[in-house]
Amino acid sequence: MREKITVARAGADAVDDLRPLFLALHRHHRSLVELPLVADDEAWRARKATYLEWFDEGRALLFVASAQDTPVGYALVVWHEGADDTFPLAPRYAELYTLSVAEEVRGAGVGGRLLDAVDDALADEGDPALVIAVMAGNADALRFYARRGVVPGEVLLYRFPRRAGADARPA
């Protein structure tokens, strides 16, 4: 894809257009981990509802990268209020909840431009802390964020309920 790519701030009205990019990211996550993930349609319904709720609450910040009016990437940030009890995040901090870039433009700087837009918006808000979660096994994402000065702070572990007749504990 060689078209000019633009990055612009968007609102709740753009959320429906994010479905293909979210599902591509969700499927990518499925390829990284051997853990149960929510089915695609259910995952999108839940994610869309979450995004729209955050917009309704005035807590969402969305940037969309587009080529010829077609979204090829997006970054969605959610604001959190209240101090963290472990890290000095201040009373208000941001979480990059989703960064997704279409496979056909990966490596072309789209993710960097989206994160630049996020960083500029955060600078306008007094440069609050930014928290980012990365799916286990996503070494490319870890390298990308490390180049941007983001460092690991904690590891999130899951234990899923045992299914009938199955033992979830390792042997």
Language-model features, listed with the residues they occupy:
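Conserved GNAT-fold acetyl-CoA-binding loop/helix
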Residues: 27-50
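Conserved beta-strand-loop-alpha-helix junction that forms the acyl-donor binding cleft
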Residues: 103-106, 118, 131-141, 158-163
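Conserved beta-strand in the GNAT
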Residues: 64, 70-79, 95, 100
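Conserved N-terminal entry element of GNAT/NAT acetyltransferase domains
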Residues: 1-16, 24, 165-171
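Conserved acetyl-CoA binding element of GNAT-fold acetyltransferases
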Residues: 87-103, 158
